[in-house]
């Protein structure tokens, strides 16, 4: 960890927290209808309600809200699945891509609807422009809106008392999309285009290369099978490449909401390491900022809405402390390189001529400082976009993003999902504190009783169950082990990372695992769907239960939930649950890998 790394991380955190304040103020006013923007575009909003047959004045119980949420997203899966299956017969397909397979289309549909954006295909070789714009980009907006409205419903549960409703799902989704996501994405898209991110609908361009490249390609027979000689070795033919095909597309418009909505699915296979998605250090900084700005602002929205800003600041402080620690560990691990290279007298020190450390799988235009920031931000949130190959991180460098996902992505987390996950841990923290002092636990004026704790237990235990059971099945099944490219502990880490990513709706991966198979398509689709909606439903149940409770006044025995003591208690609860749940699995994967480095060095 050098001065440059520290300075870049510090500047980023300061800019993020400073920007979160006005964004939170805007979000609060939009959702309560007091913003001037809502008044200006009110006729458009009301026209949408009339067209859809919705009465915006009618609010929903938590069960109605949950049913609307699940049904809306299930219809999104069906629409996107159908679009990917028939894209070959639709316009907007200059490359003539055919339909995706049944399991591939279903996996992709579930992935984008659940805000995971897990991609086991090469987008620029698989998905048409129409499917990208009408299918994937639309779901990038709607899945992000779903996460935000769920946390808004939970916040209303804390803010209201003796109420039977928590809002109107259709009104919430419309306002979040119309007044928050669309304008913010438009601004970010314009800034990205200024940096060189492309935005067009041209066919792919064939351009001559500056230098002819030659390589040995396998000779194929008439059926396309490799030809072998008498000894069974493949026959090769020398091939020269004088031209290159450059993929085009409407990238900037999708890139903006991909980052802002913590979606993460790339227009290209290289994701945000591709120069057409992320060409400059400034665009990289902007994309990291876009990932975390709404999650950070929502913490302050929580405080504003319940009438005690200190509560939101405390949650934001806990997240920021954890984020800073993760950035420090990640950057130090990558800047330190590996003992194996050090034992070979390779110079790993940073200097004006080199970044030093472990630069494998990283872009030289970003270096270790910005890469470390991106790795932590994308896995602390439920984004999953990458500007480097996570499979090439050091064992400790790979452990950090894996653990951030396994903690439930509550360190800022996805838009909405991060805050409602952290508030669930806050309920668990005050429950534990209540047990220690012998008092009924309270949080922001609401008693936390057995029903809330049952729902908290479901939220806390469901994703670890999906991760560990899914990993176990994949390790035991032949179809699961067949995808491992790197045997040993790293192969296990690849599978553990895949299910941690899917169940927690992140979408990033250790690329050495081949997952475009029916086995992994079905397994990860199940993990993604239940990881998303298996937690949303109990969160909405908590919201409904809290809204119906009376507000109680704080007394001398009430645990303060706005000071440093609560921040420490909250972080301790998050880390303890994660450590106890995943430590054995992490020891078998990244833990063993890290120890093997020192064995190799000697």
From Swiss-Prot:
It is a multi-pass membrane protein. One of its GO terms (molecular function) is potassium ion binding. It is found in: Cell inner membrane. The chain crosses the membrane at residues 3-23, 64-84, 135-155, 178-198, 282-302, 313-333, 418-438, 456-476, 522-542, 565-585. Pfam families: KdpA (PF03814). The keyword Transmembrane applies. GO terms for cellular component: plasma membrane. This is Potassium-transporting ATPase potassium-binding subunit. The gene is kdpA.
């Amino acid at each position: 960890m050098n001065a440059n790394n520290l300075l870049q991380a510090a500047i980023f955190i300061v800019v993020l927290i400073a920007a979160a304040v006005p964004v939170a103020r805007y979000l609060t006013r939009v959702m309560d209808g007091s913003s001037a923007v809502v008044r200006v575009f009110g006729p458009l909003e009301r026209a949408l309600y009339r067209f859809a047959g919705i009465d915006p004045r009618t609010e929903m119980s938590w069960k109605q809200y949950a049913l609307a949420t699940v049904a809306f997203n299930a219809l999104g899966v069906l629409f996107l699945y159908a679009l990917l299956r028939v894209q070959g017969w639709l316009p907007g397909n200059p490359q003539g891509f055919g339909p995706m397979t049944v399991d591939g289309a279903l996996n992709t549909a579930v992935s984008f609807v659940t805000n995971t954006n897990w991609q086991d295909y090469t987008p620029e070789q698989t998905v048409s422009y129409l499917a990208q714009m009408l299918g994937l980009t639309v779901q990038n907006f709607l899945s992000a809106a779903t996460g935000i409205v769920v946390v808004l419903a939970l916040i209303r549960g804390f803010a209201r008392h003796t109420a039977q409703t928590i809002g109107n799902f259709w009104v919430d989704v419309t306002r979040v999309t119309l007044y928050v996501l669309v304008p913010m994405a438009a601004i970010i898209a314009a800034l990205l285009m200024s940096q060189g991110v492309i935005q067009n609908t041209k066919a792919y361009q064939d351009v001559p290369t500056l230098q002819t490249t030659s390589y040995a390609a396998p000779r194929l027979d008439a059926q396309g099978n490799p030809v072998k000689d008498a000894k069974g070795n493949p026959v090769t033919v020398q091939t020269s490449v004088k031209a290159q095909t450059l993929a085009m597309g409407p990238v900037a418009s999708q890139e903006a909401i991909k980052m802002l909505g913590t979606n993460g699915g790339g227009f290209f296979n290289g994701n945000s390491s591709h120069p057409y998605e992320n060409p400059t250090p400034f665009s990289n900084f902007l994309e990291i900022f876009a990932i975390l700005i709404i999650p950070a602002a929502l913490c302050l929205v929580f405080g504003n809405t319940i009438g005690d800003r200190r509560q939101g600041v405390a949650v934001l402080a806990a997240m920021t402390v954890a984020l800073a620690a993760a950035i420090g560990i990640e950057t130090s691990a990558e800047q330190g390189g590996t003992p194996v290279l050090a034992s070979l007298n390779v110079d790993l020190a940073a200097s004006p001529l080199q970044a030093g450390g472990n630069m494998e799988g990283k872009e030289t235009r970003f270096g270790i400082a910005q890469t470390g920031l991106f790795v932590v931000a994308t896995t602390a949130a439920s984004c999953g976009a990458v500007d480097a190959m996570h499979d090439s991180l050091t064992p400790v460098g790979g452990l950090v993003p894996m653990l951030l996902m396994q903690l439930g992505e509550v360190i800022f987390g996805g838009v909405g999902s991060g805050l409602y996950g952290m508030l669930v841990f806050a309920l668990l923290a005050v429950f534990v504190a209540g047990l220690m002092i012998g008092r009924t636990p309270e949080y922001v004026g609401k008693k936390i009783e057995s029903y809330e704790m049952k729902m908290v237990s479901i939220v806390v235990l469901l994703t670890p169950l999906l991760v560990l059971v899914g990993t176990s099945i994949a390790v035991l099944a032949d179809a699961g082990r067949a995808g491992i490219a790197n045997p040993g502990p790293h192969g296990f880490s690849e599978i553990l990372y895949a299910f941690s990513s899917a169940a927690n709706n992140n979408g990033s991966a250790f690329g050495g695992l081949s997952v475009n198979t029916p086995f992994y398509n079905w397994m990860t689709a199940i993990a993604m769907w239940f990881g998303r909606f298996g937690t949303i439903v109990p969160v909405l149940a908590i919201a409904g239960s809290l809204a119906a409770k009376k507000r109680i006044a704080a007394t001398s025995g009430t645990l303060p939930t706005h000071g440093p003591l609560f921040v420490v208690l909250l972080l301790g609860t998050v880390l303890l649950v994660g450590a106890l749940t995943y430590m054995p699995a992490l020891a078998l994967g990244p833990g063993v890998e890290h120890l093997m480095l020192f064995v190799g060095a000697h």
